[in-house]
Regions:
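Interaction-interface detector
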Residues: 1-127
Length: 127
């Protein structure tokens, strides 16, 4: 199955849909199918890879456009990549993965945490 992201103003993803590989034999065919399906000849669609995150293809294939697109992601046409929305003001974009990094690394002790933007800390989630 092929996945496509519909872009709105500012190249922000507004929708992600799946198209069967028999229809989307390549990116151009998938885009034309979606324009016809939605009767939106001027809409902008970009293919995205379900298996790509942080520039790594999780099944060992070739990474495609750095990250699988989601609603509110931005398509950067210079990088030819999808960038997720910035989760917090203090986080910075990792130029190698195009994912957002917190100013303090996530604890690796197996517990669940939430980011506390005010204190710039990871707060343990109590259950």
């Amino acid at each position: 199955m092929a996945h496509f992201a519909k872009l709105g103003k500012g190249n922000i993803v507004t929708k992600v849909v799946v198209v069967h590989n028999n229809i989307a034999t390549d990116e151009a065919a998938g885009i034309q199918f979606l324009k016809d399906l939605y009767n939106e000849p001027y809409s902008v669609w970009v293919q995205t890879s379900y298996n790509t995150r942080g520039g790594v293809h999780k099944t060992g294939g070739t990474p495609f456009r750095m990250n699988y697109a989601g609603v509110d992601y931005k398509y950067d046409d210079v990088r030819d990549a999808f960038i997720p929305p910035k989760p917090f003001d203090s986080w910075t974009l990792n130029e190698d993965t195009l994912l957002w990094n917190p100013p303090v690394s996530f604890p690796d002790d197996g517990n669940r945490y939430n980011w506390n933007e005010t204190n710039q800390t990871w707060d343990l989630v109590s259950e």
